[in-house]
Each structure stands twice: as C-alpha cells, then as structure tokens.
Amino acid sequence: MKKQFLNYYEILSQVWFNKYTIILVLMTIKIYLFTNSILSNLTNFKAYTESICTSLDTYSTVIASLPEQLSKVINHMVASTLNSMKMQSLKMLMTIITIIKSLIVFYIDIFLGTYICILTAAIGGTVDFALDSTQSVLKSVNETIISVSEDIQDGLNGLSKVINTLLSGVDKVKSFFTNQDTDSTEYVDKVNLSIKALQNIKIPNSVLTDIDNFKDKVPDFNELQNTSKLVSKPFEIITQELNESAHFKNITVDQLKLASTPPVNFCSNSLDIDKFYSNLAKKVQFTSNIIIIVLLIMAMFAIASLVVVEYFKWRKSQRMINEILADKNQESYFVSTRNIMNKYNSSLIYYIEKFVTIPPSRKDNLYWLLSYITTPYSLTVLIIGLAGLFTVMLQFIILQIILKSFKSLTTELTGFKTQIITLMDNATSSYIKETNSYIGSQQKSINDELFGNIRTASTSVNSTINDFLMKMNTTINSVFANTPFSKPVNTLVYCTIGRKLIKIEQGLTWIVENLSVSLPQLPKNLTEDFMTNYSKDNHGIHKLTDNVTSGITFLLDTYKKSLLIELYISSAILGIWILQIIIGLTLIWYRSSSNCKARKPEKIQGEPTIGNPKPLTTEQRKEYGYPHIDPFNEKVDASSSIYSL
C-alpha cells in the first residue's frame, strides 16, 4: 500500500512559507511602505519649509529694519525740535539781552543824569547861598575891624606918649647903671606897628572867589556817562557772536545717526534645511533598515526554528503512537487516546507535562483551557494581534525619531523671534544712546556757546558796574571829601544809584551761576516699550513660524492617527484572543456544573452492565481527526504526518 502522508523532508519543503514568516514579511513590507511614505512627505515638507524659511527671512528683515525706520522719524522730530528750540532760544535770548542792555543803560542814564542835575542844583544853590552870606559877613567884619582899629589907635596915641616918657626915664636909669645908651623909640615903633597891623586886618575877597570857584568844581560825571557805552559793548559783542555762531545753524537729519539694521538671515544661514532634512531622512532610513533587517532575520529564524520544531514534532508523533499502542487494552482507550494526541499536538501542554507538576484535580481543566486558547484559530488571532502591536511600536519608534528632530527645528524657528528681538533691542538701545549723546553735545554747545557768552557778558557788565561805582566814589570823594557835603552826597548817591547797581550786579552774578539749559533726551525705557509693543503685535513672524510648526504637527498627527487606528485594530484582535480565555473559563465552569449533576446517583432498574463501545467507521475517524486505520488490525507506519496535527 502506497503512503498518502508527507514525511519529514517533504514537510520541510513548505516550512519557508509558514505563518510566522509570512507575518514577519508582511510586517517588513508595512515598515517599508511606512518609511517610504514618511520620506516622500519629508521631501514635500522640505520644499514647504524652504518657502516658509525664505518668507521668514524676508519678514524678519522688514521687522529688523523697524528701528531704522523709527529712527528716521525720531531724527526728523529731534532735528525739528532742536532747530525750533535753538532758534526760539536764540531769539528769546537776543531779545532778553537787548532788554537787559537797554534797561541797564536806561537805568544808569536816568539815575545818573537825574542825580547829576540834583547834585548840581543842590550844590550850586548851597554855594550861592554861602557866597551871599559870606559877602555880607566879610563886609561887616571888615568895617568892624577898621572902626575898632581906629578907636584903639586913638587910645594908643595918648598911651604912647606916657609910655615913651616912661621909657626915656628907664633908658636913663639903665644908662646910668650900664654906661650904655638905649634907644626907647624901638618899643614905640612896635606898639605903633601892632596897631597898624590890626588896622590892616581884612578878610580878602579871594574867599568869595574860592566859594564861587567851588561851584564850578561840582562833578559833571562826564567819565561816568561813558559807562553806558561800556555796558552796551559786551551785549553788542555777544549779539554779534550769537549771530555768527555755527552752533545756531539748522541741524540736518544727516547729522543724526540712524539705528543700524542688522543682517537677518537666520533661517538661511543658521538653519541648513537641506542638511536637516537630509540627516532626518538618513536617520529614518537607517532606523527603517535596521527594523527591516531585524524582521527578516526573525523571519529566517522562524524558518530555522520551524525546521527544528518539525523535527521534534516528528519525534513526538512516534512517541504518541507508541503510547496509543500501549494503552489499547485500557477501558478508557478512547479518552486516553485523545488526551495523548492532544498532549503531543500542543507543545505548551507537552512541556508543562514534562517539566511542571500539576495536581491531578486541576490538570484536566488546565490542559483543556490551554488546548482551547492554543488552537490554530486562536493562535492565528493571537499572532496577528501581537504582530500588529509590534508593528505599531516599530512605526512609533520611527515617528519618534522624526518628532525629536522636528522639535529641534521648531525650537530653532521659535528662537528666531528671540534673536530678532535681541538684535532690535541692541540696535534701538545703541541708537538711543548715540542720539542722547548727540543731544547732550548740543546741550553742551548751547550752554558753552550761547550761555557761555551770556556768562562772559554778565561778568563784563559786572566788572563795568564795579568800575563805574569805584569811579563814581572816587569822583565824589575828590570833590567833597573834606567838605560837609561828603556824607550826604555819598548817602544820596548810594541810595539812588549804588544800591540799584549792586542789585543789578547780584542779578548778573546769579545769571552767571545758574544760567544753563537742559535738553530733553530720549527715554531709556523707549526700547523696552517698543519691544513690549512689538512682542504683542508681531503676529507675522508668529504666523510664519506657526505655519512650519503647525505643518510639522499636522504631518506627525496624521501618522499618529494612522498608527492609533492600527493600534486599536491590533488591540481589538488581541482582545478577541483574550475573549477566548473568558469563553474557555465559562465552558469549564459549565462543564464542571454538568459533571456534578451527572455524578448524582440515579435509580437503576435491573442489573447494571457495562456495554462494549461501538467501533468508529473510517469516515467517522477522519471526521473526528483520528487515524483512519485500525491500529489493532493493520500495521502502523509511524512516519505519517497525521500525528503532527
């Protein structure tokens, strides 16, 4: 009889397309297609990123030029403000200079002229009064002296005779004692001369001439009247210098510096898109190749493993036949044969039986449950579910590599905003610093050139006023120093002129010490305010970077959704296999309940006998999976593959 089964070597010819290898090959194909899809999308997204990058650079350049554009507007405002303020200050200052000069000159002229007239009139009237009084006094004195001298002369003439007689006697007595002659007429002459001198006493008319001449010596202050010209001269000089000063020419916008526009090519220079996507594609391709190689190795390993498995299954089939033949005389031959076949058909039960000791009370239910969940149908569901989960995991690994790389790209794109803000902040700060420095130099020039001249003029006027006061005092003292008019005149001049001039001098001194201008400068927080407003309003750059990040997110989300669908499907398939466990446990519970009912004693009618089971036909053996030959009547060929089922 020819054999109708496959031997071991014939079975090996079909091992290479076993279900495990086929699943691994399908997983490899899935990974390959997934990788190609990602690489294709990366190529498309590379072009999109380059387009966005170009737009980002263009927009960033426009944004970075905002400080320069802003500085142009500010420069116009600063130049216009400085020019207007300088011209208005110049006009106001020249007006003030003219007013001050005119007031000082007017004040000096009006008081000096007024009080020269007052002094001249007062002194002239006083001199005239003194002259008239002196003339009357002189006339009266002269007449009195002449009258008195004549009366005295008459008395002296009589007295002279007596004295002369007496003197003659005295001379004689003296001559008697001294033997010298004495001339007594000497004394008479002296007496007569004294009377003549008294007669000649007369207040000269030159006194009247001196008093009259004193009136002509009243100071006219002609030298002091030149003070007006001296006071006016510094003001005229400063007016001329201000008109000729170059610092008061109009400031042009070109003289002010503009905020620099930094070159902004972050995306083009800092971000090498070609290199990024090339490296990313290499990473994806490398990871995919590794996964595919591993899967192919696993497929080859599955083939090799099944070769070994088939070998052991062939050996187990021979042992199974031997055990069946050994149990052919047992009463439970049918159940025992099926248990033996089940043990050898299930590798899991076979090795548990071989290496694990299980209580007999639980062995049947455990082996039955293992047989139920490891049938070819259940194992197919389990393998497909696990293979699906494993495939999803591998695809997630590839996707995670892309996600990690894109995070660095997104970080760089997001960092562009910070870099642009930093550049704009530096440019704006530098511009504000330079502009404030220029305004400070203009302020110094105005204080030095404009108010410096004012201070010079004030000092000169102060000096002139001091000279004026000194000359005025000198002039007055030269005339009235030793006269009764000295103190009143000095008091009058001080109260009317000197006091006012001292106040003017104090005012000019205050101007010298306090005259300065402080120009307003650009606020330092202008940069902070500008950058704060920019950060709130820079939707453009946000939109561009968000387009890239949203595109990346959309791409990754699409693949994630696809993988999640695969994950759900694989989990559902695996859940079906887990459901088999629940069904198996339910069937065990149901079978245990049925067995308990079957064990209940029933009333037996008649004498119990044990019947002989009816042998199965050939068709029934084939239907139930038993050997379709009778092992008791025919010789069994143990090389049949039927026992490997």
Curated annotation (Swiss-Prot):
Glycans are attached at N142, N192, N226, N250, N426, N462, N473, N514, N525, N533, N547. GO terms for biological process: plasma membrane fusion involved in cytogamy. The chain crosses the membrane at residues 22-42, 103-123, 290-310, 379-399, 569-589. Residues 624-645 are annotated as: Disordered. Keywords: Cell membrane, Conjugation, Glycoprotein, Membrane, Transmembrane, Transmembrane helix. It is found in: Cell membrane. Residues 1-21, 124-289, 400-568 are extracellular. GO terms for cellular component: mating projection tip; plasma membrane. It is a multi-pass membrane protein. Residues 43-102, 311-378, 590-645 are cytoplasmic. Residues 624-637 have a biased composition (Basic and acidic residues). Disulfide bonds: none annotated. Belongs to the PRM1 family. Involved in cell fusion during mating by stabilizing the plasma membrane fusion event. This is Plasma membrane fusion protein PRM1.
